Amino acid sequence: MEDYLQDCRAALQESRPLHVVLGNEACDLDSMVSALALAFYLTKTSEAEDIFIPVLNIKRSELPLRGDNVFFLQEVKIAESALIFRDEIDLLALHQAGQLTLILVDHHMLPKSDAALEEAVAEVLDHRPIEQKYCPPCHVSVELVGSCATLVAERILQGAPETLDRQTAALLHGTIILDCVNMDAKIGKATLKDNEYVEKLEALFPDLPKRKDIFDSLQKAKFDVSGLTTEQMLRKDQKTIYRQGTKVAVSAVYMDLEAFLQRSGLLSDLSAFCQDHSYDALVAMAIFFNTHNEPVRQLAIFCPHEALRMTICGVLEQSTSPALKLTPIPSISAHLQAYLQGNTQVSRKKLLPVLQEALSAYLDSMRTPAGQLEAALGMSREQADKELDKASNSLIAGLSQDDEDPPLPPTPMNSLVDECPLDQGLPKLSAEAVFEKCSQISLSQSTRACPSNK
């Protein structure tokens, strides 16, 4: 693959049309490997001898934040210098010059900042439900499996298995195992197809690492935050939610929260992080494993604005859908509230609707006479929880369990920043809304009938 990647870089210097395989903005291991393996395969099988260029959808400077990516590249002997990052290729200029064909892998929807590139998208390969209300006007292959690398492996082995070398097989094999939590049936992340293609890769290359060995190594590398600054730790796996001008960062922190709170200069680091990125609040979701290898989840809410902080904390403490079962942890600052999260099944994805409710409650309080906020929350809390539960269920109806985070630390998922159904708040439970949701579910299910290019 090294020679191929050198050819890709050389192609960037030529004035010629380019085929780009673009991973998602999280650039997790699945996204990186899927882009590399699919582009390599398409280049090898191109009848016109076109070159397909894999592009990692982050800046080169951000790669060190993804420890499992860095570790695996070293493990399979691919030099970081050979890779092409988003800040090293001007996709917009290529598109405006009519020289860009884009293939999306491990995502199916471009962020608003890339809206101008939509016309260049020729194919989509993803493993999560279609969020748009229409089938993109291109070849679309979407299947709900644990890892997009599974779909890439399927594409290769069904199309031209003779092109698969051990290096690419090792990349796909390790990625599927990490994404599917070592194929553990109790976790429920791996589908039959994930298991099928892991077994096929192992049959073709019997010297691939043992599953437990590669899973343990990748997971250790993924959650290794030693040497990272506070800002790097917060940016390593971060989502952002907005609500009428209020902006909240939601970051996964892969260590014991109590140890995190003892970091030197932490409060000034948190303040600088929020100020530099214009966040009104920061929610840190800590997760680590105890001595019994059981997941432990903790929460910290940092917010200098007392009203916003109290509203977020109040909604989280009172939430029953889901019930977080929070126990306060002694705080190091009046601007920070920390908790032990008793319900470890509540992942970030499941917490986001609750945080959206908190932002709505805060914004409502800005329009509510002083002293009435608590009464408003308390008076309708039970009803509000029921309505939130119904609304959340209506939002995820039609999605498979595969799209939910596992009860272990998840790999970074596609960004929820842009075009998320929750960005505009929870829907009103009217007859029209129910009808609209049913229509969306039907469209989502019908995407299986869209043409795919295998």
Swiss-Prot record:
Q: Per UniProt, where does Mn(2+) 1 bind?
A: D28, D106
GO CC terms, sorted: cytoplasm; cytosol; focal adhesion; nucleus
Q: Does the keyword Acetylation apply?
A: yes
- What positions are modified (Phosphoserine)? S400, S415
- Keywords of this protein's UniProt record, alphabetized? Acetylation, Cell junction, Cytoplasm, Hydrolase, Manganese, Metal-binding, Nucleus, Phosphoprotein
Q: Which residues bind Mn(2+) 2?
A: D30, D106, D179
* Compartment list: Cytoplasm; Nucleus; Cell junction, Focal adhesion
Q: Which InterPro entries match?
A: DDH_dom, DHH_sf, DHHA2, DHHA2_dom_sf
Keyword Metal-binding assigned to the entry: answer is yes
Which parts of the sequence form the motif DHH motif? 106-108
An individual GO BP term: regulation of neurogenesis
Taken from the record, one Pfam family name reads: DHHA2
Query: How might one describe the regulation of this protein's activity?
Result: Activated by magnesium ions and inhibited by manganese ions. Inhibited by dipyridamole, moderately sensitive to IBMX and inhibited by vinpocetine.
Q: What SUPFAM superfamilies is this protein classified in?
A: DHH phosphoesterases
- Single GO MF annotation: tubulin binding
Q: Which reaction does it catalyse?
A: diphosphate + H2O = 2 phosphate + H(+)
Where N-acetylmethionine occurs, the residues are M1
Q: Where is this region: Disordered?
A: 398-421
Recorded family membership: Belongs to the PPase class C family. Prune subfamily.
Q: What does this protein do?
A: Phosphodiesterase (PDE) that has higher activity toward cAMP than cGMP, as substrate. Plays a role in cell proliferation, migration and differentiation, and acts as a negative regulator of NME1. Plays a role in the regulation of neurogenesis. Involved in the regulation of microtubule polymerization.
Q: What is this protein called?
A: Exopolyphosphatase PRUNE1
Organism field: Rattus norvegicus (Rat)
Encoding gene per record: Prune1
